[in-house]
Amino acid sequence: MAYRTFILSAVSALALSGCAVGPDRVSPSPPSPSATSGPFLSAQTDIVTANPLPQDWWRLYEDPVLDGLVADALGANTDIRQAVARMDRARAALRGARSDRLPTVGLTASAAYSRTPEFETPPGADRTGTGISLGADVSYEVDLFGRVSGQISASRNDLAAAQADADAVRVMVVADTTLAYANAASAAARIDVARSIVALLDDSLRLTRRRHEVGMADGLAVARIQSLRDQRAATIPEIEAQRSAALFALATLTGRTPAELPAISGERSIPLEIAAPLPVGDGTQLLARRPDVRAAEQRLLADTDRIGVARADLYPRITLGGSVGSSASS
């Protein structure tokens, strides 16, 4: 009868283990798709689409050199490795929190040897003896007020926040690499245009000088074209410096020195363009893609869970335990 009462009590305690005392989560309702897609598609529907943006969005440029630079940057960035290490730490904390749901088992073992003095030993009796004892203790915390489940949920949200932080670093690295490559290509294109204009102005200057020599143009026309030519030529070193800065940034992002940067990285002289319409999705998808928003949401959920854990600590902890042992001597 006592054993049956114990079993019923244990089952009742387990049934009540869902009585968490933490605050309820209230998630904001997402806006309707019609309210969020309009601002993105009302201007020019042939430029953007409502399709979701792919994770490897830089491949939309269809540039193998850019793909290789992004892969190198992701592999060389130390901030990403640190973010991954923080994810591993959060994952280990989650495993530790989940282990609190399992019973705790302790094993004990002992052995003893004894020898009785001869004057205390009856005739014919053995003077030596050995003893062995084994035991096991089992304890289990009944999660009556949600302390254990709250810790698990908080650790799970911490892991999700760490994953979002790692995604944010990856997004930043990819964006910086793509921007540096685009700036280098754009600067190269501007240099080509500036040099072409200078060449045209040189031809115009030669023709104007000849006309001036035969009296068909005055000196003011020659001076004006010369000034335009010099002004345009003066912009070339500035643009070349911008291109060099972009290539230096690419070298830094990919973990190389400027001298080690492959020459092919700076050969493109055509600005980057996306041939197909740009998939942007809607406002809800845009917010869902932002890692900083996801990280903030997960940290808020983790803090909410910890409020419940703190409240559960104010209540008694219920632990079920049992032990068994055996001993033998000879």
Segments and roles (model prediction):
Residues A85, R89-A92:
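Membrane-embedded segments
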Residues I239, P291-D292, Q298:
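Metallo-beta-lactamase
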